[in-house]
């Protein structure tokens, strides 16, 4: 049996009596006692997540921009100011999603990318292959010397500033999907990004691994609640945010995973997967579902891989959960393209077909329920 990977915060999680699970080969906390309370902390105050299993990768060289114009589906031409971030898919030639990632632009010769844990080695190998084939001459450096802490919630930024006062000046005017580099803090040189995976405001902080436990402890002392993967999943699902490997993978087009907004076909770029996307177009709708109640009760919980029956053919739930914010069973589903918002469909739960309503994503954003 292969030993699990540990983040630099593993001992801190265990000291907090976290319930640990194998998450894609990483020993990670699923909760610290109450997943619901952790979820609520992020929606109403401030919570923090260890996301150090994700991998920071630095790209340097004179042709970094040209490399990303070819490598990713979104358009790095949008990255003009230092610190600007871009969410994109990394595609294979068939138009399938190898990974979803965030690209940060700092200078014309320095871009930084954060990739998912389970796909990191595959991504880096693919980047190296594209770099070599295209003769871009880019230096690609995985940075396992970094850890990442996500501080999320309506009070997250204030509590982060209380913990790292030096970050306030550099980040107080930071707009969403932008990052700043903050040098000389007690926790080393930081990259602080106004990004997240919860539907709430906050920061994702890239910190030297040797300092991350001190930062984690200081944030906790300033009232930021440690949160595990369980709350992270319910929060991201409410927020309408995809999970790689569940809502899309290398056999699924971003156009069929609710990610058409991350694909830029307007610029004349020959990016990997473009020809396949243009040839195939959109084949399915990616929608939200809310399980309908009878006599005030739902007959089950929506879960991944349940079959969705519609008048236009069958679909499948990709992610599902019970929403703490809505007190409803919610899901993402890939369904025939003719399915419309507001339609009623049937979901096969055990031996029953139960009604669910099709809604526009997201369900919740900034603490407000949007899907009724």
Curated annotation (Swiss-Prot):
One of its GO terms (cellular component) is glycine cleavage complex. GO terms for molecular function: aminomethyltransferase activity; transaminase activity. One of its GO terms (biological process) is glycine decarboxylation via glycine cleavage system. Signal peptide: none annotated. Keywords: Aminotransferase, Transferase. Its EC number is 2.1.2.10. It catalyses: N(6)-[(R)-S(8)-aminomethyldihydrolipoyl]-L-lysyl-[protein] + (6S)-5,6,7,8-tetrahydrofolate = N(6)-[(R)-dihydrolipoyl]-L-lysyl-[protein] + (6R)-5,10-methylene-5,6,7,8-tetrahydrofolate + NH4(+). Pfam families: GCV_T, GCV_T_C. The glycine cleavage system catalyzes the degradation of glycine. Belongs to the GcvT family. The glycine cleavage system is composed of four proteins: P, T, L and H. This is Aminomethyltransferase. It comes from Burkholderia lata (strain ATCC 17760 / DSM 23089 / LMG 22485 / NCIMB 9086 / R18194 / 383). The gene is gcvT.
